[in-house]
Swiss-Prot record:
This is MAP7 domain-containing protein 2. It is found in: Cytoplasm, Cytoskeleton, Microtubule organizing center, Centrosome; Midbody; Cytoplasm, Cytoskeleton; Cell projection, Neuron projection. It comes from Mus musculus. Residues 1-32 have a biased composition (Gly residues). Interacts (via N-terminus) with microtubules; facilitates microtubule stabilization. Interacts with kinesin-1 family members, KIF5A, KIF5B and KIF5C.
Length: 781
């Protein structure tokens, strides 16, 4: 565009004369000022000649138009290319966005799954830590309970030893009943420190106490390590037999009547042998007092056997004890209950002198002795609770229930001890004197008492441990059930989540497949549509070609048909002209014949002098004949074509001569069809001719006269100067020639009687226009 402007306006203006193009894109100072560039262009144009300007304009106009068109097509192509590139970029950017969105969604989903698994793992770790903390707390609690029970056992053993020492001192100081009672009443209980620091007086007592202590320790350690299978049969019997023992007042009262003069195991066996004999020989005792020693001996034997079996050491006599006593004791728990109930009321264990003394012997309860340790334990527990409140939430109800049970237990023991103390205080003095009078009847040593106490404590500990074990097992089962339920719920949730994930993935895949199938179907439909359109176009083109070919063929056929029809029409016209000429010739000959006939008739009548008939025709008929002679118009319509023919008198006088082979019966055969309008025209012309002929006045002739017509010959007629007389023929011969020429008549002959004046001419005309002649004409045409 700039180049065309430069060509139009010159090089100095920078394209200023290019119709305003130089103003917008010119190189000089005319950018943005189109008027200056136009003025420069006009000044340069005025400097040149008009011829050069006109020639240049005439040369530059088509060049600029061609360049503009070329540049416009290039611009359109460039714009179309830019649009295509822009569309492709948009599609690529959209696909990239879709891919990024899918990638982000996938990353988000994976992140959510990882976060969920991480949370589940953290929750599992927290549960494991919580379970470990609970287990550690339970073990610590069991250790503390074990230490507390051991401390209780040690304190009870120290108290028992203190009582035994006090008893020995009282028995050694006053051998009589009075002195012993007084000492026992006035002697206060020794403190724990004194009991522990005072050396024992008898070596047998110390050894028995040591053995009992070791046995208790071994029993405690062995029962802690016993499995559940070994504890179940024995613990069931012990639990029923030690319910009353654990809450009996023997724990608070101890066993004050223990013999301290036992020095060897042989002495113990002798005492065991003599005790039933002395009990059976004593008749002053009641049934209850007599039955108690035997029951006590049985219990002692059973307990010694169990302690020896669990401890694994002891005297040979204890090892050799038969197992029948153990089975009896385990199978009959009622005996232990009876002994526990009757043991405080026996004369051997009851000491009314202590209760009746002004300085009463007061046994401090176990709860009061354990208060400092319990306080320390409570403070420690409170600190642990404050330090780990989340971990102790599950253990707190257990500790509270355990402390509550222990407090109830201590309160019950205190109440039972007070009750027995009041009963002993209100008991009659005779029974006390009776018991005091027999110092050797129910005496036992310190070892037996320690063993009995250790057995009771062991049974209580076993029962407690069994209950604790059952409770822990129950809690463990509940915890496992809860964990199992939680695990199942978590598995179910994960299964549902995975199923949902699979369902979503399946749904997404189905949607993707459906979308792809739809795209494929759409592409296939488009391809089918394009193929259909292509086929339709091809079909239309083929139809157009076929139509064009058919049209061409039709036109060619029509042209051929028109040529053939034209040729046939020309032939028919020629034939009709020939027929018309022949008809006119025949008519002419008939007229000549008629004239000659009239002349002959007139001559005959003149000869006969018969003035009836005038031979001269009327003047109007002659005028008509004369008028018809010079010009004969023949108008024939064949397929909308009019043909006029003028026939002069000279031409009629010298008609055309046709070859011999044209007319076999006077006509030329033609193979083409003849239309009806031709025949109508012919019939009309014939009617006109008949009218002309009928208008003539012909004199009536008879049959004989017609027969006597002289002979007529066309050859003789052609020769001028010949007459009927010279020919030597009559009228009959002429009529015969006419009939031979025109053919036989196709109608019945009429008689002469029925003929009128005009019948002769009419007969001739009808003979000429007979149906046979028409058929011959139709066959010719």
């Amino acid at each position: 565009m700039e180049r065309s402007g430069g060509n139009g306006g010159g090089g100095g203006g920078g394209g200023g004369g290019g119709g305003g193009y130089g103003g917008s894109g010119g190189g000089g100072g005319g950018a943005g000022v189109p008027s200056e560039g136009a003025a420069k262009g006009l000044s340069l144009l005025l400097a040149k000649s008009a011829e050069a300007a006109s020639g240049r304009a005439s040369q530059s106009t088509p060049r600029s138009a061609g360049m503009d068109g070329f540049l416009k097509s290039d611009e359109r192509q460039r714009l179309a290319k830019e649009r295509r590139e822009e569309r492709e970029k948009c599609l690529a950017a959209r696909e990239q966005q879709i891919l990024e969105k899918q990638k982000r969604a996938k990353l988000q989903y994976e992140k959510q799954i990882e976060e969920r698994w991480r949370k589940l793992e953290e929750q599992r770790q927290r549960e494991d830590q919580k379970r470990a903390a609970v287990e550690e707390k339970r073990k610590q609690k069991l250790r503390e309970e074990e230490e507390r029970l051991e401390a209780m056992m040690r304190r009870s053993l120290e108290r028992t030893q203190q009582l035994e020492l006090k008893k020995k001192c009282s028995w050694a100081g006053s051998p009589g009943p009075g002195g012993r009672d007084g000492e026992s009443e006035n002697t206060p209980p020794l403190p724990l420190t004194l009991a522990t620091s005072t050396p024992p007086l008898d070596t047998g007592t110390t050894t028995a106490a040591a053995e009992s202590t070791n046995a208790c320790d071994k029993l405690s350690t062995s029962t802690m390590n016993l499995p559940k299978q070994t504890e179940s049969p024995m613990s069931k019997h012990l639990s029923s037999s030690t319910v009353a023992i654990s809450y009996s007042p023997d724990r608070a009262l101890g066993s004050p009547l223990k013999s301290s003069y036992k020095s060897s195991p042989t002495r113990t066996t002798e005492k065991k042998k003599n005790t039933p004999i002395s009990a059976m020989g004593d008749a002053g005792k009641g049934a209850m007092a007599g039955g108690e020693p035997s029951q006590m001996e049985k219990m002692k034997k059973g307990r010694v056997a169990t302690s020896a079996a669990s401890g694994g050491h002891g005297s040979p006599l204890r090892r050799c004890e038969p197992p029948e006593d153990i089975s009896k004791r385990l199978s009959s728990p009622v005996k232990s209950k009876i002994t526990s109930k009757t043991y405080p009321q026996s004369p051997k264990t009851a000491k009314p002198t202590y209760l009746g003394s002004p300085v009463k012997y007061y046994f401090p309860p176990i709860a009061n002795e354990e208060t400092p340790k319990k306080k320390a334990e409570k403070e420690k527990r409170n600190k642990e609770k404050e330090g780990a409140p989340g971990q102790q939430s599950t253990v707190l109800p257990r500790e509270e229930s355990l402390e509550k049970r222990m407090a109830d237990k201590y309160a019950t023991e205190k109440y039972v001890a007070d009750k027995h103390a009041t009963e002993k205080h209100s008991a009659p003095g005779g029974k006390a004197e009776h018991s005091a009078g027999k110092p050797t009847a129910g005496t036992t040593d310190a070892g037996e008492a320690a063993k009995i106490l250790a057995e009771k404590r062991r049974q209580a500990r076993l029962q407690k441990e069994q209950e604790e074990q059952e409770r822990l097992e129950k809690e463990e089962r509940e915890r496992l059930e809860k964990e199992e339920l939680k695990r199942k719920a978590e598995e179910e949730r994960l299964r549902i989540e995975m199923a949902y994930k699979r369902e979503q993935e399946k749904k997404r895949q189905e949607e993707e497949e459906k979308r792809k199938a739809e795209e494929k179907a759409k592409e296939k439909a488009e391809e089918e549509l394009l193929s259909k359109e292509k086929q339709e176009k091809e079909k239309q083109e083929q139809e157009k070609k076929e139509k064009a070919m058919i049209e061409k063929q039709k036109e060619a056929a029509e042209a051929k048909a028109q040529d053939a029809a034209k040729q046939m029409r020309l032939e028919r016209e020629q034939i009709m002209l020939q027929i018309e000429q022949e008809r006119l010739e025949r008519k002419k000959r008939i007229d000549e014949i008629m004239k000659r006939t009239r002349k002959s008739d007139a001559s005959l009548e003149v000869k006969k002098e018969d003035p009836k008939v005038e031979l001269q025709p009327p003047p109007d008929v002659e005028n008509k004949a004369n008028k018809a002679k010079p010009v004969v118009p023949n108008k024939i319509e064949i397929n909308v074509l009019n043909t006029c023919q003028k026939v002069s008198g000279s031409e009629r006088a010298a008609p055309e001569t046709f070859p011999q082979d044209i007319f076999s019966t006077g006509l030329k055969p033609v193979g083409g069809p003849v239309h009806l309008d031709v025949l109508d025209g012919k019939s009309n012309s014939l009617d006109d001719s008949t009218e002309d002929v009928q208008s003539m006045d012909v004199s009536p002739v008879s049959k004989e006269e017609l027969i006597s017509i002289p002979e007529f010959s066309p050859v003789s007629e052609m020769i001028p100067g010949m007459s009927l007389d010279q020919n030597g023929t009559g009228n009959a011969r002429a009529l015969q020639d006419i009939l031979d020429f025109t053919g036989p008549p196709a109608f019945p002959k009429k008689s002469s009687e029925n003929l009128s004046l005009d019948d002769c001419n009419k007969n001739l005309i009808e003979g000429f226009n007979s149906p046979g002649q028409e058929t011959t004409l139709n066959t010719f045409c």
